[in-house]
Amino acid sequence: ADSVIGEGGQGYAVLERTIDEGIMAVGSEAVGCMEKLYKETVEYCRQREQFGQAIGKFQVLQHRMVDMFMEHEQSKSLMFMAAMRMDEGYGPEAQKAISAFKVQIGKSGKFVGQNAVQLHGGMGMTEELSIGHYFKRLTIIDTLFGNADFHLKRFGAL
């Protein structure tokens, strides 16, 4: 009994909060990765020419870049909401916000990463560009601390 840290039977609650703080940390990293992917893709589309003009002038690609921007902004908004809920006090509302944030970064990270790679063409996954690195990192972050199914169930149970 002298070796017990904290109160007996409270281990899971402490662990759950620690995991949620970890989600906030890697989730914030994911938002930064998405922002970098979006900005590098926009810049690349301004420079890369096809058929005598920058590919960023093609409407279809403009729409994709807007969709990338919106996915990033949705993730960033949920990040701020989850951080505010944590700041108000850790409890069910903070847990719900964190689970919603985790689901969103998984969805948005995949979308932004795949589109960044595709719009960069074959260069997207080479070691010369950071695009592939950020996409791989987003893929790993999606698997950390529970996938979308886990967090959707958790959200519903709260």
Description of each model-found segment:
Residues 4, 8-158:
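Alpha-helical interface subdomain recognition
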